[in-house]
Amino acid sequence: MRLLWVTENYPPSPGGMANSCDRIVHGLQQAGVAVDVVHLTRRDLAPRGAGVRTVPLGDDPEHALRQFWTTLAPGADRYTHVVAFGGTYPLLSAPVYAAWAGLPLITLLRGNDFDTGMFSLRRQPVVLEALRASAAVCVVAASTAPLVAALAPSTPVTWVANGIDTTEWQVLPSERQKAAAWRAEHVAPGRRTLGMIGQLKNKKGVRLLLEAVVAGGHASRFHIVLAGELEPGLDEWLAGHPSLAYTALPFQDRYQLLGVYAACDLVALPSFYDGLPNVALEAAALGIPILASDAGGLADLVDDTIGFRFPAGDPHACRAAVHRAALADDDQLAALGAAGAARVRERFGVASETDGYLTVLAATR
């Protein structure tokens, strides 16, 4: 089995999708699948080693994509599948490459591709064509599968949850010491740290949660940690609510965030819509209770056994979840965290993720 893997998200590009792509590719390679990654990018990247080809899109992506086919065509018969992973240009080009090469197309649909792509005048036709041209579609949230099936009824859709390697995702003693020192300097005694981590854009519900903390009268119980890129206007909102103690940290590499996680008593993901964010798995794997909506794949991971869940977009339910979290004692939080870590180990490991993709690939050869 040999895959032509077309993506816009691959290291050294930053972000959760690049991390996910790298993890899935590595898992398949470890299972004996040959994967040739085609990284479509507008960034100036140095040439990579064997198995990764960078295709600079530049100012003329149409030319770059067509030119790539010229170099691909003579050896296209060595592949068994074409895979489209995340982003508009992979969803645009991979169906064409698959059709011209006479190969099955597997589309690995990520949250952003579908959730907002379906309501974009520019992207909707691209996404729909890719779904309908696919021999199989994989989604990271169980609730997304029927939505895809309604739009592409003849295409098989499979839920394959994101995974995490818990053996390598651990906080070092030195990181815990730094986190404790940071808390001693920045967090008032008696306050719990509530972290929101990643690209904190509109869909992540950041303001929904902050408003729930303030409106519920719990601003004095929490210190908010905002680690990542903030949505526009959030700085002004925070300035207008001086009762809310917070620290804003810049976007950081995944492993740099281990120190941030170590400083958090809870991690919040109050998304309006989502896939299955890596942050949720990372926090749960470290034994940190999660305060989250039931958007997308968060519903597959989070329940009251491991955290505080509420219906996505419901401000009253969000306020109630914040209230429950504020009143939980240390023993309750520790029990929730331990249950979350156990759930991730049992249900969301990399081996399960890889097996899911291997099953789909084998069924479409």
Predicted region positions:
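Short hydrophobic beta-strand element within catalytic cores of glycosyltransferases
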Residues: 289-292
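Short His-centered aromatic/hydrophobic patch
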Residues: 84-90
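Donor nucleotide-sugar binding/catalytic pocket of nucleotide-sugar-dependent glycosyltransferases
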Residues: 107, 127-178, 188
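Short alpha-helical donor nucleotide-sugar binding micro-motif in glycosyltransferases
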Residues: 259-264
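Conserved donor-binding/catalytic core segment of Leloir-type glycosyltransferases
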Residues: 4-6, 188-204, 210-213
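Nucleotide-activated donor-binding/catalytic signature segment of Leloir-type glycosyltransferases, i.e.
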Residues: 235-252
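Conserved acidic donor-binding segment of nucleotide-sugar-dependent glycosyltransferases
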Residues: 304, 308-316, 325-330
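Aromatic "clamp/platform" in nucleotide-sugar-dependent glycosyltransferases that forms part
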Residues: 272
